[in-house]
Amino acid sequence: MHFSKAVVKFRIPIIIIALVLLVPSLFGMMATRINYDMLDYLPGDMDTVVGQEELLEDFGKGAFSFIVVEDMEPKDVKTLCSEIEKVDHVETVLSWASLADVSVPMEILPDEIYREFNTENSTLVAVFFDSATSADVTMDAIRSIRSICGKQCFVSGMSALVTDLKDLCEKEEPIYVAIAVVLATVAMLIFLDSWLVPFVFLASIGMMILLNLGTNYFMGEISYITKALASVLQLAVTMDYSIFLWHSYNEKRSEYSDNKEAMAHAISETLTSVVGSSLTTVAGFIALCFMSFTLGRDLGIVMAKGVVLGVIGCVTVLPSLILLFDKPLQKAKHKSLIPDMTKFAGGVVKVFPVFIVVFVALVAPALYGYNQTNDEVYYDMGECLPEDMEYVIANSKLSEEFDLASTHMLLVDANLAPKDVKSMIKEMNAVDGVKYTLGLESIVGSGVPEEFLPESVTEILQSDKWKLLVINSEYKVASDAVNEQIDQLNTILKKYDSKGMLIGEAPCMKDMIETTDHDFQVVNAISIVAIFLIIAVVEKSISLPFILIAVIELAIFINLGLPHYLGQSLPFIAPICISTIQLGATVDYAILMTTRYKAERLAGSDKRASVSTALATSIPSIIVSGMGLFAATFGVAVYSDIDIISSMCMLMARGAIVSMLCVIFILPALLMLCDKLVCRTTLGMAHLSKKNKSKSEVK
């Protein structure tokens, strides 16, 4: 109570401090760099990551793009290349014309090289940058190149992808927050008992969201996914805590004549309840931090921090605001639109065997769909973008006109004998889907003496430490075909140079697939175990964690199984994140009902009356909480043109509804079925089991 009384006493200073903290938070939020490159989150010790660093360090080359130039004369292409070379951070521009010095007749260059760079109406230009794929300066360079090239040119590559992604995110993100706020407000206006309190909630939660976004500055940078989802998720998840305080305060007002004393008791009650409840949510987010694909750590830390700040705001800023606006809040109260649920709850409990059958019947198809969905995810980030984006159009041109879907790069020892390199190139060219392997050795020896090659070309393909070879592939990034191709190329490479490295977007994506497959198992296990232990401690029971997690896991299986049955493919990160977010965020519904059920049983009610009362009293809170999460995420899912954001928000929205329905219909049935087991395995309830037994013996 000391803390609660202090909050009430210092309510005005608390509001002033919160408002003052918004200023540095705003600056911190604006200064936090946003990372749009998924490949940056791969473990740093992987060959693909090490190879990218070597390429940048030894050749001064980081990002790489192909430009498709249509209907342009060779002399104009040459002029265009000269203009592109002047762009800041463009390291090298490689085209058909640049492969030979002007004094060397083009006729003596291999036909394969000509075909690689030219079709009937198009020319291919390769651009190397001296900065990393997702560096701000690289994205600026991409924009400059596009402005120079005009409508006849199409810029592809990962840097073009992250540039388009950044531009689209910056355009959409403010609208995400606006949609979430408007729809969450509508949900609260409908389901709460005051026309004014939703706006007080939003003020308190909004301050905590800004503090969370501002403190991200100390992380250095966050991913665009984290930035897009953080505000929406924090609003949806921490809304529950505000609702709990408001309900508690209204109850205490009827017990105490002084509203300040009522608030002090409400804060104490809320703190006890909300800390236990928030632990499951925090555990779900912290589980993401155990991913070796460090995007999970990024999202996990930011969201766990947001939940903690949400709890702090709920017991400090929110009570201060409620007391400040108490009179208008009380005047704006109205009767709740949610009817009395006693009769409905009695009906659900009466037919509980039906819901046991439903539970058993749903497990197999839900689990099958869930496993299939996990197998059908996509990893190509280009699929996240709308079809009219410049990157997507450029990739289509590259595929249609040059039959080119992905580009790999090889780094081999500079001292590797030319004959071995030629032999390796020959073997690699024989691999299915490889169009051509370009290196010094594929030019030299085809009628072109090495000394005839311009220095600009030899510098691109060889340094003191490494030889660089470029492999063009017909196979799409992240496809099974390209992954098998990469395995074959790596086998050939290691035969000639055990320290050689195969790098590029497709090899990185293959590493990402293998990394996230492992992460999925780890994160799921950690989140389930952590939440199991928290429920076991909170409920002082061994059996209840199994029952509660079974209910929410079924909801997760249904939610993530539906995309398979609907013929939808999800971005790879969605199932990993959603399974933990849904478990952590919605298991609170089950804990709320179970806690009331225990209290009723300990008060002497039989199992039917206990479950009915628990269900009837919990439904309003579960509906408000579930609809709040649904409202905050559904609008964003419908609006967003970025599939990874849209998919994750749709899964969260649907997950809230599915979890809500499972808790309302299936959890009561399981509590009825397992009542004896619960009593025997829950601290302080064993005597109820004996009591039931003695009653049955008397009968």
Describe each PLM feature range:
Residues 1-34, 133-376, 477, 494-699:
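Membrane-embedded transmembrane helical bundles of large multi-pass transporters/channels
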Residues 44-65, 69-162, 371-378, 382-544, ...:
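Structured non-transmembrane domains adjacent to transmembrane bundles in polytopic membrane proteins
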